[in-house]
């Protein structure tokens, strides 16, 4: 006899309760960016409850100020210091479906429980991969996909990012603080390349003014690691290693390989100005099991849904290099 929806739902709930952390680790254990910024929340992490867009305040200029003498003129003008970027909601899902034939073939308590948990775990892996695959893309604001790191660092000055066209945001010195910062020179990865790229994204001296996270491919990471091991000039971040990600710390930058990083790329990010906004009701939320509405097929289905986007509050705090070997 087929299980009732109450029974299927109970099995699903038990799966998430009984396995505890192992279940939620599925969302984060294949991508360093997902682990570091979404699970460990080592960056911006907002949980809006709604709105048409995700509002992210940003600072791009200085207010009025200076030295003065008694009787001198003091300005009270208000510079337009704070503006806001607006990122659109992006929606991802993973599907779990059980056909009636599956239930017949998996009769018995153990078999049906295993079937349901396997299907749900696969839905978790699916939604995770969909998100992780888009972290590094260059899709426009209006795309259904996440507004990725390439969009942050490589989109042109006439292309909107976070709802702002870079040439529309001008600092008092005439520069464009909302432009993407990148290098496309074809060259080999080296410590010199890392230092020079980090300098292009330097906001100011101090612990929060420079990139502190580096993301690259396993191939490039191994090259960097080999250079540093020879010179014995690096340490390792223990928390990241415990999470299962090989890493090294070089000149206050945590550098790690991410399987989803595109070939030939290195991204240097400042975690104080980048992270995630995830809807309060959309952090891998589960829908109840329901009838599968498909012609000539009987079954039940549920979804794991995610609503959010990658957000940036200071675009020039990050830089990327392509064409590396």
Which residues does each PLM region occupy?
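Flexible, glycine/threonine- and acidic-rich loop/arm segments that mediate assembly and lattice contacts
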Residues: 1-325
